[in-house]
Curated annotation (Swiss-Prot):
Belongs to the glycoside-pentoside-hexuronide (GPH) cation symporter transporter (TC 2.A.2) family. InterPro entries: MFS (IPR011701), MFS_trans_sf (IPR036259). GO terms for cellular component: membrane. It is a multi-pass membrane protein. It comes from Macaca fascicularis (Crab-eating macaque). This is Solute carrier family 45 member 3.
Length: 553
């Protein structure tokens, strides 16, 4: 009994909770990094054309772009015995596990189900790729919100996001390293099968272990029946009445979609500038990262992905893919180092200098990749992009925290030009029941709108509440509505949408550009050009109060 009590106290310690949460961060990044490395060559090998291959890679980001703001709002208002975040994390994790099963076994499943397996194999492979990309990237939004829920103190917030960035980099290192190993000749091959089956079997084992760690996270519990918002007389429904709750949820879901569109489109100018800068920076970096292994395999090693197994051309391509995986591994290793020293860099040089330096370093690295035919130079350039990767993982989110800590300065309330109708004529309903703004959560946190003032944050992080009350306003003219107080979870979802959107344009257009140019070097040229555009928009970001007057925000 004493031993159990000691273990329970140990697991509920702040550092233990931080490690348990970020184990899932590690697992997600391992799966995504291995997928980014291995999926494009796999699609090319089964006969998907270059332009269609890039479009397949855009399926997950497009779906995520639509669902991330909605999921962020739904998570803020969810109530259940397992908390607000973990049910969404577990549901998305199931999708990832399904994709890890489908991708290496698409041909085997297609052969079992139909006599002509080729079309079904392609369909199952595309389904698996889209599911992995969508669930893996969307899962980061409730995970970031869970960190913000549990680590609200400025010092703890800074530590939480530093560990978060560190675990992303560490997961990327392992995820890029695993495809670089020739598993066909390893000791695991007789037990796990081919290269693909060995790789994805290991990914499944790693991810299951990381998801199991979230069972020990001490998230807030349910508070009981939700109180209706002020001024509302919501009908009371028994908790066991599932059809009633389902009808209510679907009714509010239909009304919430246009409201979310309004919230995202009418975001404050400070956040809009940060969004555009992050979008351009991520677009450049993801164009580089998504197609780097294909560029090395075809461009540097002169391999052919559709060549027969055992031929010289195919062997060169496979060697190039493994060398490309090594370059991306070094990218994550450099990112890991910078995530450890990022706080010191910001304290020494300031957020503006570090952010601009990281964005400016990228086109230099991408340009060197375009111009050089040396494997060593290209690999070193890929490693240099880890600085940009680390900065984009940390600084935009901590700037968003700064905006919310001083929301009266950086996030002014917006009101329409015309006068509104009386409150009696409007009906407001919550999407899902949740605690009132300012009401304490069971773990002692205070919701958005609480009266407590937080102390000044350290260099990287400002604490803020992570719950946002997104209410659907029915029966009131659009111009009379007041944009509700924004919570950080919605704005984190918007920043995550920039990351997802940054993969859509490259996925849609890069394949056609490469086919027109007849050279995979077009991948790197496009990345360098987007990096130059990102430098301009990075100079327009609001880093402190002096920028508000400078940019007339």
């Amino acid at each position: 009994m004493v031993q159990r009590l000691w273990v329970s106290r140990l697991l509920r310690h702040r550092k233990a909770q931080l490690l348990l949460i970020n184990l899932l961060t590690f697992g997600l990044e391992v799966c995504l990094a291995a997928g980014i490395t291995y999926v494009p060559p796999l699609l090319l090998e089964v006969g998907v054309e270059e332009k269609f291959m890039t479009m397949v890679l855009g399926i997950g980001p497009v779906l995520g772009l639509v669902s991330v703001p909605l999921l962020g709002s739904a998570s803020d208002h969810w109530r259940g015995r397992y908390g607000r975040r973990r049910p969404f994390i577990w549901a998305l994790s199931l999708g990832i596990l399904l994709s890890l099963f489908l991708i290496p076994r698409a041909g085997w499943l297609a052969g079992l189900l139909c006599p002509d397996p080729r079309p079904l194999e392609l369909a199952l492979l595309i389904l698996g790729v889209g599911l992995l990309d969508f669930c893996g990237q969307v899962c980061f939004t409730p995970l970031e919100a869970l960190l913000s829920d549990l680590f609200r103190d400025p010092d703890h917030c800074r530590q939480a996001y530093s560990v978060y960035a560190f675990m992303i980099s560490l997961g990327g290192c392992l995820g890029y390293l695993l495809p670089a190993i020739d598993w066909d000749t390893s000791a695991l091959a007789p037990y796990l099968g081919t290269q693909e089956e060995c790789l994805f079997g290991l990914l499944t084992l790693i991810f299951l272990t990381c998801v199991a760690a979230t069972l020990l996270v001490a998230e807030e519990a349910a508070l009981g029946p939700a109180e209706p918002a002020e001024g509302l007389s919501a009908p009371s429904l028994p908790s066991h009445c599932c059809p009633c709750w389902a009808r209510l949820a679907f009714r509010n879901l239909g009304a919430l979609l246009p409201r979310l569109h309004q919230l995202c489109c009418r975001m404050p100018r400070t956040l809009r500038r940060l969004f555009v800068a992050e979008l351009c920076s991520w677009m450049a970096l993801m164009t580089f990262t998504l197609f780097y292994t294909d560029f090395v395999g075809e461009g540097l090693y002169q391999g052919v992905p559709r060549a027969e197994l055992g031929t010289e051309a195919r062997r060169h391509y496979d060697e190039g893919v493994r060398m490309g995986s090594l370059g991306l591994f070094l990218q994550c290793a450099i990112s890991l180092v910078f995530s450890l020293v990022m706080d010191r860099l910001v304290q020494r040089f300031g957020t503006r200098a570090v952010y601009l330096a990281s964005v400016a370093a990228f086109p230099v690295a991408a340009g060197a990749t375009c111009l050089s035919h040396s494997v060593a130079v290209v690999t070193a350039s890929a490693a240099l992009t880890g600085f940009t990767f680390s900065a984009l993982q940390i600084l935009p989110y901590t700037l968003a925290s700064l905006y919310h800590r001083e929301r009266q300065v950086f996030l002014p309330k917006y009101r329409g030009d015309a006068g509104g109708t009386s409150s009696e004529d409007s009906l407001m309903t919550s999407f899902l029941p949740g605690p009132k703004p300012g009401a304490p959560f069971p773990n002692g946190h205070v919701g958005a709108g609480g009266s407590g003032l937080l102390p000044p944050p350290p260099a990287l992080c400002g604490a803020s509440a992570c719950d946002v009350s997104v209410r659907v306003v029915v029966g009131e003219p659009t111009e009379a509505r007041v944009v509700p107080g924004r919570g950080i979870c919605l704005d984190l979802a918007i920043l995550d949408s920039a990351f997802l959107l940054s993969q859509v344009a490259p996925s849609l257009f890069m394949g056609s550009i490469v086919q027109l140019s007849q050279s995979v070097t077009a991948y790197m040229v496009s990345a360098a050009g987007l990096g130059l555009v990102a430098i301009y928009f990075a100079t327009q970001v609001v880093f402190d109060k002096s920028d508000l007057a400078k940019y007339s925000v």
